[in-house]
Amino acid sequence: MRLEVSRHCPARPTLRGRVFRACAAVAGGSLLVIALSGTSGARVFGPPGAAGPPHYVSLGDSYTAAPLVPNQTGSPAGCLRSTHSYPFLVAAGTGAATFTDVSCQGATTANMTHPQSVPLGTNPPQDNALSAATTLVTLQVSGNNIGFSDIIIHCTTLSLTNPFGSPCKDHYTSGGTDKLRAKINAAAPKVAADLQGIHADAPNAQVFLVGYPVILPNSGNGCWPLVPIAFGDVPYLRGVEKALNSMLAVVAAANHATFVDTYTASIGHDVCRAPGTKWVEGLIPTSLAAPFHPNQLGEQGMARRVLTALG
């Protein structure tokens, strides 16, 4: 999918009456003003490096694609991309000259260089979207390398057996080895290889590796049964997510990419918060988003972090 992003964009209503507005600010639209409700005001962003608006390519998994967040777009439809995902907001906020979003739900590091089968089609290798003309790349990947969906299924199911214990932690650390930490370690060289491939395919691009926002509360033992993760498993899974983000930060620094920390800004917006505050939905979403995935507020929050990183 290749989209040309207009430099003159009207206000667009979002969930719960919030408004995203992007419109050309100065000559030729080379700078753009973006105002997101809930921020301190409009911010001005220039192009990320080379003169003129960026040629932007978005790579990633479901946290990038924003499944079920309105409006779903693109091909193959099974990738579940939203027009309100953070890449779309970043494209508007930078006044991107061209914008290509090839993110896809379920993507792993392997799908940067290998096709991905999804319902209703196949997503080509995501790196195919890159070229020497590309000047901005965002990548968000590795959650599926550690088995994000399986973790959710196991941990929510096991919470019913011992809601005040740590059945999920016990499952993943049985035998004396933390299987999730091992998967994080195994993913590190694969993320590094993806970044190296991006630099090879898009030698003129600034590359940003985007981390994952808070899912479970940053302190305490969660909110079972509202979100069915056992009390003792919340600190464990919180540590797993922090370890994943730490790995991404280290790999980014070692491979000429800028790490975008979305975790810190999302503290206080976890799945246990009320609708209108939480950035990530729980097992039973209260707004249009996939379970345990960012809603529209979460995508806006991640967009702000990426735009801030662009400087």
Q: Language-model features: where?
A:
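Serine-esterase "nucleophile elbow" of acetyl-processing enzymes
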Residues: 44-106, 128, 156-162
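Catalytic His-Asp segment of secreted/periplasmic serine-dependent ester chemistry enzymes
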Residues: 213-311
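Conserved N-terminal glycine/acidic-rich loop preference
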Residues: 136-137, 162-201, 208-251, 255-259
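Charged, often glycine-rich, active-site loop that binds/positions anionic groups
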Residues: 106-124, 271-286
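Secretory targeting and sorting signals
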Residues: 1-44
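Oxyanion-hole/transition-state-stabilizing segment in secreted/luminal serine hydrolases
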Residues: 67, 120-183, 214
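Structural recognition of the beta-strand scaffold that forms the well-ordered cores
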Residues: 55-60, 64-66, 98-103, 135-140, ...
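Short amphipathic alpha-helices and their capping/turn segments at secondary-structure boundaries
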Residues: 41-55, 121-138, 191-206, 307
